């Protein structure tokens, strides 16, 4: 009997965003739990300069080792460096890396290295696509934040006609933009907190005027967020006017547009969505941060946050949370999976945002919700890859 051919999965991780370390952790977890009987695993790490490096498969990559893997070595006859914050051990043979790169990262990625950050694909050069497609069956996108979760890599993979996990270009871009997604939620009849947006130019031109605008339209406490970041990067809760300028300055470091939201007092929950044409809502998870809010540290440090799944809300409210999570997921045109962040206040459910590539680290919310639904992490990865290979219409 002929042995069934394994599915070749490239795990795309790392990248240039502020969420690089989260991405590496997500990638490491995926690599560890993928079934080697079904999959040929190709880890692909994008370094801080945007360079792509295919690495050997290691069943248990070590995130603890953040030393330089190989310093200032020639890779594919180019002066590239293995990223200093690699998830892999430093004992890997350089020749093995070169061999893997020759096999999996063919002409189009060498072109990308030259063109980065400006993508310059030759649409008439069909050889580019033909060279790459036999090497990879599907890409598991483990990137987070801008230039990973915002539609850019999704567009590249669409051009190359390569299936990938998660949502398409439009849904990814909308999910990354908190301002546009809030406008869409409102149009879809989904409750959102009161908000205004302020751009850097207006802020610098007249800070006092913008502070008055915030006081009059939102008040305190207020939530300050960069429009295009995830993992609570650059987010602050401001309780009084004297702390506002500092919080705005922090948010503007990450994005030229800042969202100022009404603070909703209530129970913070997240609800995962899984599926393509007929997605299901997973059991909601309740988030109880030990600090002021569910910030970057609380999200990725288990001791900093208590997470309870299923959430301690009524059965009726659970159904309501799941209903609006599905509604938000569909409003953006998401497919595959997502995680919808919400607040329950009294009888109301406020949708905060949709994460089109939820974290899949050991500390992440989405795998815990899947587990509560009876789905193991390995099975979850199988489902996500299967959903990607179904090749649904992606927007």
Residue ranges and their predicted role:
Residues 2-13, 17, 25, 126-133, ...:
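Active-site nucleotide/adenylate-binding loops and adjacent lid/helix of ATP-dependent enzymes
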Residues 236-323, 344-350:
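Phosphate-binding site of ATP-dependent enzymes
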Residues 286-338, 368-395:
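Active-site "cap" helix and flanking loop/linker of ATP-utilizing ligase/carboxylase catalytic domains
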Residues 145, 232, 287-291, 355-369:
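Glycine-rich phosphate/pyrophosphate-binding beta-alpha loops
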Residues 262, 271-273, 329-362, 370:
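Conserved metal-phosphate-binding beta-hairpin within the catalytic cores
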Residues 41, 163-164, 192, 222, ...:
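Hydrophobic beta-strand scaffold residues
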Residues 1-170, 174-176, 180, 199-209, ...:
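ATP-binding N-terminal substructure of ATP-dependent carboxylate-amine bond-forming enzymes
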């Amino acid at each position: 009997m002929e042995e069934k051919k394994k599915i070749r999965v490239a795990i795309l991780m790392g990248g240039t965003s502020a969420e690089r370390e989260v991405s590496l952790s997500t990638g490491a977890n995926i690599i560890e739990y993928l079934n080697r009987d079904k999959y040929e695993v190709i880890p692909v790490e994008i370094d801080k300069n945007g360079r792509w490096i295919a690495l050997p498969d290691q069943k248990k990559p070590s995130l603890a080792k953040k030393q330089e893997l190989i310093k200032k070595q020639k890779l594919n006859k180019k002066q590239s460096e293995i990223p200093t914050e690699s998830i892999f051990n430093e004992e890997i043979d350089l020749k093995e890396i070169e061999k893997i790169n020759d096999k999996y990262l063919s002409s189009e990625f060498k072109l990308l290295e030259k063109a980065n950050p400006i993508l310059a694909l030759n649409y008439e050069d069909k050889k580019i696509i033909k060279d790459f497609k036999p090497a990879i069956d599907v890409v598991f996108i483990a990137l987070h934040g801008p230039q990973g979760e915002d539609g850019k890599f999704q567009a590249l993979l669409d051009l190359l006609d390569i299936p990938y996990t998660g949502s398409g270009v439009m849904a990814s871009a909308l999910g990354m933009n908190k301002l546009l997604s809030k406008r869409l939620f409102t149009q879809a009849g989904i409750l959102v907190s009161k908000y205004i947006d302020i751009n850097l130019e207006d802020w610098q031109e007249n800070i006092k005027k913008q502070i008055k605008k915030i006081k009059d339209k939102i008040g305190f406490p207020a939530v300050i967020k960069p429009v295009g970041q995830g993992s609570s990067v650059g987010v602050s809760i401001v309780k009084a006017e004297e702390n506002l300028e500092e919080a705005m300055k922090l948010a503007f470091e990450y994005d030229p547009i800042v969202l100022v939201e009404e603070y909703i007092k209530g129970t913070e929950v997240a609800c995962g969505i899984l599926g393509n044409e007929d997605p299901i809502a997973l059991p909601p998870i309740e988030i109880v941060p030990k600090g002021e809010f569910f910030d970057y540290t609380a999200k990725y440090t288990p001791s900093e946050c208590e997470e309870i799944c299923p959430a301690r809300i009524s059965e009726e409210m659970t159904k309501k949370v799941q209903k609006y999570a599905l509604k938000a997921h569909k409003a953006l045109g998401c497919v595959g999976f997502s995680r919808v962040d919400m607040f329950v206040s009294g009888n109301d459910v406020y949708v905060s945002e949709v994460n089109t590539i939820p974290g899949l680290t050991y500390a992440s919310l989405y795998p815990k919700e899947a587990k509560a639904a009876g789905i193991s992490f390995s099975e979850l990865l199988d489902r996500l890859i299967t959903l990607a290979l179904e090749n649904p219409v992606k927007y």
